[in-house]
Amino acid sequence: MSMTILPLELIDKCIGSNLWVIMKSEREFAGTLVGFDDYVNIVLKDVTEYDTVTGVTEKHSEMLLNGNGMCMLIPGGKPE
């Protein structure tokens, strides 16, 4: 039998790991996943924010991202 994993279970397995978040806007975030809630609002630490239009990056120690604005979550962090 194949094993089924639910989306929130997969995100839960990523806590403490690097995560790359692509937003619906022109922003991307890469950091370590600290936690999340049922609405997939997430808390990241050691965050790098990327503006895909201007190419500008910013560093943040911690950040809360609204799950409603997310397009994609990619475990493993942003590729270099």
From Swiss-Prot:
Mind giving the lineage of the organism this protein is from? Eukaryota, Fungi, Dikarya, Ascomycota, Taphrinomycotina
- What keywords were assigned to this record? mRNA processing, mRNA splicing, Nucleus, Ribonucleoprotein, RNA-binding, rRNA processing, Spliceosome, tRNA processing
Q: List the disulfide bonds.
A: none
**One of the record's GO cellular component terms:** nucleolus
List the GO molecular function terms. poly(U) RNA binding; U2 snRNA binding
**Protein's organism:** Schizosaccharomyces pombe (strain 972 / ATCC 24843) (Fission yeast)
The main location class comes to: nucleus
Q: Report the function annotation for this chain.
A: Component of LSm protein complexes, which are involved in RNA processing and may function in a chaperone-like manner. Component of the cytoplasmic LSM1-LSM7 complex which is involved in mRNA degradation by activating the decapping step. The LSM1-LSM7 complex loads onto the 3'-end of single stranded RNA. Component of the nuclear LSM2-LSM8 complex, which is involved in spliceosome assembly. The LSM2-LSM8 complex plays a role in the biogenesis of the spliceosomal U4/U6-U5 tri-snRNP complex by accelerating prp24-mediated annealing of U4/U6 di-snRNA.
Query: Which parts of the sequence belong to the Sm domain?
Result: 6-79
Subcellular location(s) per record:
Nucleus
Q: How does it assemble?
A: Component of the heptameric LSM1-LSM7 complex that forms a seven-membered ring structure with a donut shape. The LSm subunits are arranged in the order lsm1, lsm2, lsm3, lsm6, lsm5, lsm7 and lsm4. Component of the heptameric LSM2-LSM8 complex that forms a seven-membered ring structure with a donut shape. The LSm subunits are arranged in the order lsm8, lsm2, lsm3, lsm6, lsm5, lsm7 and lsm4.
Q: Does the keyword NAD apply?
A: no
Coiled-coil boundaries: none
Record keywords: Ribonucleoprotein included?
yes
What biological-process terms (Gene Ontology) are attached? mRNA splicing, via spliceosome; rRNA processing; telomerase holoenzyme complex assembly; tRNA processing
What is this protein's record name? Answer: LSM complex subunit lsm5
Which CDD domains does the UniProt record give?
A: LSm5 (cd01732)
The entry sums up its family as follows: Belongs to the snRNP Sm proteins family.
Pfam families registered for this protein in UniProt: LSM (PF01423)
